[in-house]
Amino acid sequence: MSELTQEFTDKLYANYQANVKFAALENAITHNGIHAALETRKSAIENTPVFSLDLTKDKVTDQKASGRCWMFAALNTFRHKMIASFQLEDFELSQAHTFFWDKYEKSNWFLEQIIATADQDLTSRKVAFLLQTPQQDGGQWDMVVSLFEKYGVVPKSVYPESISSSNSRELNTYLNKLLRQDAQILRELLATGANQATVQSKKEELLQEIFNFLAMSLGLPPRTFSFSYRDKDNNFHTESGLTPQSFYKKYVDLQLEDYVSVINAPTADKPYGQSYTVEMLGNVVGSREVRYLNVPMERLKELAISQMKAGETVWFGSDVGQVSNRKAGILATDVYDFEAGMDIQLTQDKAGRLDYAESLMTHAMVLTGVDLDEAGRPLKWKVENSWGDKVGTDGYFVASDAWMDEYTYQIVIRKELLTAEELAAYEAEPIVLAPWDPMGALASN
């Protein structure tokens, strides 16, 4: 190994002090911060929130201090349909209801994974991966579908937010304490030679404790409820005796098996035209597995535009923290000028960022519009976020087309939009990716 010598450091000092621009930038950045000093005027001008195709102006939602973006994005696609179908002024489905059942199911999923890996050492990478974070707030499209299909949905008025759903840190801390403790109990029980019936009985006993903890923290979810509302014409509507499943069937009425996940992961280990899944990724035991079809980025954008032209918004996953201005609501590759400002070259491409852990899916949002040029090519995209209405334009963001190319990884579209060849590839036996693959990262936040 080569040490850093004083002579080398002296050389760096001299080079820095010889560049008069650096002194000005040092003053600007130390007083204002990197982003404020390097923010470009050009990016704000080019990414105004005006779009040739704009599907909704509904009020945005707010996930607050939680990692429920994937749920919010899915429920937002549903509520847009409901607002239009039932002529509502505004409406939200309960994100907390889906959150409760996700925590419950993830706990069982984790314990089943612990049982399945009981023959491996605690130091094995898979067991260590499980124990590092037994569960968290994140998830994937197929995971939220599994929850909707099993538990339905309810209006937010029926099961509102709690402190622990809006700010989930305490909940996650103590739920993970319980799960790690339960993992030890089950592994030690299995080490004694206990049969599966005994192990499952113990697991059910542990799940009762977890269920009690969740119910006390989030509130006990309703089994039946009434739903009343007034439409835009002030007509009153009410219905009683609903269950979460019957409410979903009557008021949402989407066939979720008609939707598929399409990704753009341009790395050497993931050839296009193949389907993929991620080992140990899921929540509901016995439900559909997480599955993606990998396609080139141009095809992914073409599919998203086709769905929006048909009048339907698009759930999508991206790395939202990359070159973004949260306050202004701008996602653009040129929002900050590091090259002119600091002589820093950020040239790593999308594949390189994935391979070297610089980028991964961190956030799910909804595409609700796009600005197309005369030839039908996208210039910028309208993004419905779930960070409240104090950021962006009333909570909506603008993503430049270049930003979409570099930092968008997944969309969910109707499978009827796929070609016969693409659909066959999606339905083929998927290639299994490692549990820590970046294509599973959205579920790890």
How should these model regions be labeled?
Residues S2-D58:
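N-terminal regions that are enriched for targeting/export leaders
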Residues S2-F22, F72-L75, L88, S400, ...:
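Bimodal feature
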Residues A44-V314, V391-D394, D401, Y409:
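Active-site nucleophile-adjacent alpha helix/oxyanion-hole segment immediately C-terminal to the catalytic cysteine
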Residues D54-D58, K350-G352, E384:
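Short helix/strand-bridging catalytic loops that position acidic/His residues to coordinate divalent metals
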Residues C69, F148, D355-G388:
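Catalytic nucleophile-His microenvironment captured as a short glycine-rich beta-strand/loop
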Residues F72, F316-D319, T368:
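Short His-Asn-centered micro-motif
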Residues S287-T362:
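Long, positively charged binding patches that form subdomain-scale interaction surfaces
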Residues D373, L379-N445:
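Conserved catalytic-core surface of thiol
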